[in-house]
Amino acid sequence: MLSPERRPSMAERRPSFFSFTQNPSPLVVPHLAGIEDPLPATTPDKVDVLIAGTGMVESVLAAALAWQGSNVLHIDKNDYYGDTSATLTVDQIKRWVNEVNEGSVSCYKNAKLYVSTLIGSGKYSSRDFGIDLSPKILFAKSDLLSILIKSRVHQYLEFQSLSNFHTYENDCFEKLTNTKQEIFTDQNLPLMTKRNLMKFIKFVLNWEAQTEIWQPYAERTMSDFLVEKFKLEKPQVFELIFSIGLCYDLNVKVPEALQRIRRYLTSFDVYGPFPALCSKYGGPGELSQGFCRSAAVGGATYKLNEKLVSFNPTTKVATFQDGSKVEVSEKVIISPTQAPKDSKHVPQQQHQVHRLTCIVENPCTEWFNEGESAAMVVFPPGSLKSGNKEVVQAFILGAGSEICPEGTIVWYLSTTEQGPRAEMDIDAALEAMEMALLRESSSGLENDEEIVQLTGNGHTIVNSVKLGQSFKEYVPRERLQFLFKLYYTQYTSTPPFGVVNSSFFDVNQDLEKKYIPGASDNGVIYTTMPSAEISYDEVVTAAKVLYEKIVGSDDDFFDLDFEDEDEIQASGVANAEQFENAIDDDDDVNMEGSGEFVGEMEI
Amino acid sequence: MNTSVTSIKLVLLGEAAVGKSSIVLRFVSNDFAENKEPTIGAAFLTQRVTINEHTVKFEIWDTAGQERFASLAPMYYRNAQAALVVYDVTKPQSFIKARHWVKELHEQASKDIIIALVGNKIDMLQEGGERKVAREEGEKLAEEKGLLFFETSAKTGENVNDVFLGIGEKIPLKTAEEQNSASNERESNNQRVDLNAANDGTSANSACSC
Ligand SMILES: Nc1nc2c(ncn2[C@@H]2O[C@H](COP(=O)(O)OP(=O)(O)O)[C@@H](O)[C@H]2O)c(=O)[nH]1
Ligand SMILES: [Mg+2]
């Protein structure tokens, strides 16, 4: 349903150069930003929407608005794309750290950096590395993935599979307390446990409909639910909640956990025997560049090195640091990091995400599935020396991802623990990884062979590798060479599992009532900082909510229909639509395909 | 039918308003070779050219205007196999910028990128416009840096096709097989995932070798 306030679409607002719907025959040359009409050499005097900050949410929003037909001016105070989602070189990180510590980058604190002399003046150059400020993985069945396909932004990018999700347990990288109970992957798993697991998996794929099963536990923890209702034991419970669900602690509520476990399972085998993907050359930094390019093609104007100084909600004029001005007819959208001086409406960013990013001189290929260069390692609560209460997640990327040179690897550690404990937990996790890696590289340990085939085509669901088992007592002789260590605390308004809700963006929307005299940001809307979430799940939700605020409805959010005669792309689009249908219901994933997949898991 | 198709990512660089987009428009909308209409993808314009029985598929990345306020992204140059660095023969400033872009490409892009330096808008010289960048200056820069060199008019179409043919010819014929085997290797090593090839039975195009 189109709401009455809905702004006209691109087709309605702009004389059509070529109508796709009327005539799907060969295109000649499309109406393109800068191809049909030369672009003006100055920034526009008047735009529909001004967006400050080129992070993921802002970039997806810019592309959505540009293709919808809005006139967008998209700026960033930095000289690079990405803002809170940037992928940076080592030199850029050095500058960023200085800015954080000078207090000129809001929402980040306590940045500590070590860079080996081997980078810059030695073996490696700053540009050999691409470090993400908030690394993410892309689930194979997710909103963002379908938008990447629809918008064709995926054509600017390369994706690689991520199949290894390790769990660290028992003060060692022994896979689990008792390897005999390794979830799914062990033939010695008691029949009863396997049955219970399968029962749970069948349930979780269609959990919402089965309220009678989970409702009674809706306010209780997921571990209670798994133990009481499905008679699962600790190793399975941990693997389900932390490795598969990627949850942050044991208090996770049942619906959230179910949704996250299902995310993994329905993503599995969409493109192959793995649930997630990583983009090459960098994560969200790379994706935001792709969406910005798409927005530019759709007509948005880009200007880096441009800082908003103030917005006047009465005259609707935004003023920039270089003295230029623009009249904004609809909305001004700003990332909290780009807030002008004297801003008074920046939402409180009360949740901390602690991050440690290391570059290690060691290929660490033992941790990757064959041919891959990415892995997740999860440290569940209580698994570390520090007695961690929250999970520490370590996302590992190798040279194959082109974010670091051959022979090196990047570890992205993060935790949702708050306060000084967080750093202790992260340090403990780092030490555990370091020890495990040294044992690994010295022993040449083979991956475990015991794997139960679960799907019809011989793929396993969980391909967890036992790291360094039985080398618990081994004391390594060598030390690991760290090329780079970056510690920082990031602040966000989105709690772990927090769903971005529309009312958040209403902070400034009660018009004049909330204007503060002297504030430079009256009448602007702030976006959210990235949360601790390791997947891109929050991005589309946030962009969509903002889109609706601006356009009046989200009906035509990325309602693109690129038709062309390139056979390959045409079939790609058909496929994208299919795919879209499958996940259209958002939380209510179509179970047809997945049902089959469960059916084949004969025990 | 010729089965060996080499795909080339080609990027355009140069000061705003030198005619980059016009050159592309001229190239893709001309009756060129025995070719069909250009195909339009959301990501880039594509145009196939057949040179000596060998088909070169240009994936042309225009700047989409992002160069106007110095906002090109690193993603833009990445893995480009060819680049047109364009200047306006009537604007000396644009030639200075061209030098800058050549330098930038040598730093940022792949080592063996083929670069064509293109002095555009030569039609203006016939119409009383004054030449501000001598042909020799362009030739000299091209020679120094190992670039192809052309002077073109996107308006009349003069020399535009030659730019792309020239680049196509510099891609050695054997590159096709090399590229195929190289990219196959890359796929098996790096597990590149094609997002259009989901396993839900809808993608019958897994055999495509574009
Ligand atoms: N006379 C003449 N004008 C040209 C030529 N090429 C482009 N133009 C004009 O120069 C302006 C800028 O061209 P455009 O292709 O948008 O430049 P871009 O910013 O580099 O993409 C437009 O007004 C074009 O019509 C040419 O060869 N001769
Ligand atoms: Mg242009």
From Swiss-Prot, chain B:
Database matches in Gene3D superfamilies: P-loop containing nucleotide triphosphate hydrolases (3.40.50.300)
PROSITE patterns: RAB
In-chain residues carrying the UniProt-annotated modification Cysteine methyl ester: 210
Regulation of activity: Alternates between an inactive form bound to GDP and an active form bound to GTP. Activated by the guanine nucleotide-exchange factor (GEF) VPS9 and inactivated by GTPase-activating proteins (GAPs) GYP1 and GYP3.
Matching InterPro entries: P-loop_NTPase, Small_GTP-bd, Small_GTPase
Entry binding sites for GTP: 14-21, 62-66, 120-123
Residue ranges of the motif Effector region: 36-44
Top-level taxonomic group: Eukaryota
Record region (Disordered): 176-210
Covalently attached lipid (S-geranylgeranyl cysteine), positions: 208, 210
Biased composition (Polar residues): 199-210
GO MF annotation, one: GTP binding
Membrane topology: Lipid-anchor
SMART domains to which the protein is assigned, alphabetical: RAB (SM00175), RAN (SM00176), RAS (SM00173), RHO (SM00174)
Effect of substituting residue 21 to L/N: Locks VPS21 in its GDP-bound form by abolishing binding to GTP
A single GO cellular-component term on record: endosome membrane
Protein location: Endosome membrane; Mitochondrion membrane
UniProt entry keywords in alphabetical sequence: Endosome, GTP-binding, Lipoprotein, Membrane, Methylation, Mitochondrion, Nucleotide-binding, Phosphoprotein, Prenylation, Protein transport, Transport
List of residues that carry Phosphoserine: 188
Any one Gene Ontology BP term: reticulophagy
Note: Present with 8759 molecules/cell in log phase SD medium.
Record text on subunit structure and interactions: Interacts in its active GTP-bound form with PEP7/VAC1.
Job of this protein: Required for protein transport to the vacuole. Involved in two vesicle trafficking steps to the prevacuolar compartment (PVC), regulating the docking of endosomes and Golgi vesicles to the PVC by interacting with PEP7/VAC1 on the PVC membrane and promoting SNARE complex formation. May be involved in recruiting the MON1-CCZ1 complex to membranes enriched in phosphatidylinositol 3-phosphate (PtdIns[3]P) or other charged lipids, leading to recruitment of YPT7.
Assigned protein family: Belongs to the small GTPase superfamily. Rab family.
Protein name: Vacuolar protein sorting-associated protein 21
